[in-house]
Amino acid sequence: MEPSPDAEEAHTVREALGRYEAALEGAVRALHEDMQGLQRGVERRVAEALRLAGPLARTVAELQRDNQRLQAQLERLTRQVEALGLATGVSPAPGTPSPPPAATVTDRAPRLGTARFSSHATFSLSGRSPSVEHDEASDLEVRRASNSCILENGHQLDAGPANGSSEVQTSSAQEPPRPRPVSLSLRMPHQPVTAVTRVSEKFSGETSASALSPTSAAIVGGFTPSPSEAISPWTPSPTEKSSSFTRSLSGSGYGAVTAGKRKDSPPLVTPPQSPPSSQPPAMTQAPRQGERRRELVRSQTLPRTSGAQARKALFEKWEQDTASKGKGETRAKLKRSQSFGVASASSIKQILLEWCRSKTVGYQHVDLQNFSSSWSDGMAFCALVHSFFPDAFDYNALSPTQRQKNFELAFTMAENLANCERLIEVEDMMVMGRKPDPMCVFTYVQSLYNHLRRFE
């Protein structure tokens, strides 16, 4: 009995459906395998990223702990500074009468001095012994005894007319000038001191003009008076020069010290103009006044350093000056050293790429231009390993078309001969094709560099 045409057609349809179903199942299985391979590659990349980010997280945590510790230390040092300020008499007493307000022109410099004096308590002290307070107290007593007849700005009272001099003597008798307290950081050796002299011409009926003349840094122990301190002959029109010295000490700890003129000193009263015949004693007292002023400036400005330390600093500075050939070369060296200390990621990649080029010179099918397509056929890996182990395999027998074989050979030889772990799988390189991930290739090449350079 022959089958009907409908039965034959149904049988043909079932066979076609079976073939389609088998092909579809094969495609689904291949897709699942590709997805699993991709998932494994992603997991490995994530694990590598976490491994690389681990030291960074630990470093950030350590920096946070250091920041908290430094904040606590800064608070503790601030409290110590406040206690030292109260102990040495830096802060004015509550019952101290404030000086009466002066004119607008004459009150400009005291306001600046007060601002500097209020900001000088921001310095930091470290490693101070309790005996410093006693030394400061004794030093203040000696200064108070020696400077009883000298004003704070370094001027001695002139023998002027009767009305002007009587007012100055009365104000100084009622409230004697207090010596300026010396900062504790001045006792520390080898700290550069810069003295800045502000000279303001006042009491002449015109707008005051202030000039700043910075003196050279007093490091060794010598002091050169600024041109503003030169002794000028007496002139009929009396002018009063008020100088405020600002010492800027660069400390080794957390800040800088700025000591200004005390605001609690009595204001100066200038005698009115008088004919030249009434001022002959001032001409004889001008040299002594200039000498005393320079001695006062030298005693308040220079750091206390021993002779050996001063000679050592002088010789070191002289050797540095003679060693350098010029300012341009010194600046160029400094610029190169600063730029070399902070290397970027691109420069590291370029250095590693140049090293790989130097090791693979003369090898066929190797042209290293980047960390992606130049390594896609595996020949670069094989050439790099073969340059260190030429007897391990025959490089000339390799072909760029056999990518999987090249990857397997290079990774296996590097793992067996150089003990370099296989950070990249052959399947991953095959899946990524002609443009593999630059970070994966760079990471593995960096590992090869760390292991192969031992055999150089």
Curated annotation (Swiss-Prot):
The modification Phosphothreonine is found at T96, T270. Residues 268-279 have a biased composition (Pro residues). Residues 120-129, 163-174, 298-308 have a biased composition (Polar residues). Residues 120-140, 154-190, 220-310 are annotated as: Disordered. The keyword Secreted does not apply. Residues 24-88 form a coiled coil. Residues 242-251 have a biased composition (Low complexity). Residues 346-453 form the Calponin-homology (CH) domain. The keyword Coiled coil applies. InterPro entries: CH_dom, CH_dom_sf, F-actin_Monoox_Mical. Keywords: Coiled coil, Phosphoprotein. The modification Phosphoserine is found at S98, S126, S131, S250, S252, S265, S274, S339. SMART domains: CH. Residues 131-140 have a biased composition (Basic and acidic residues). Belongs to the smoothelin family. This is Smoothelin-like protein 2. It comes from Mus musculus. The lineage of its organism: Eukaryota, Metazoa, Chordata, Craniata, Vertebrata.
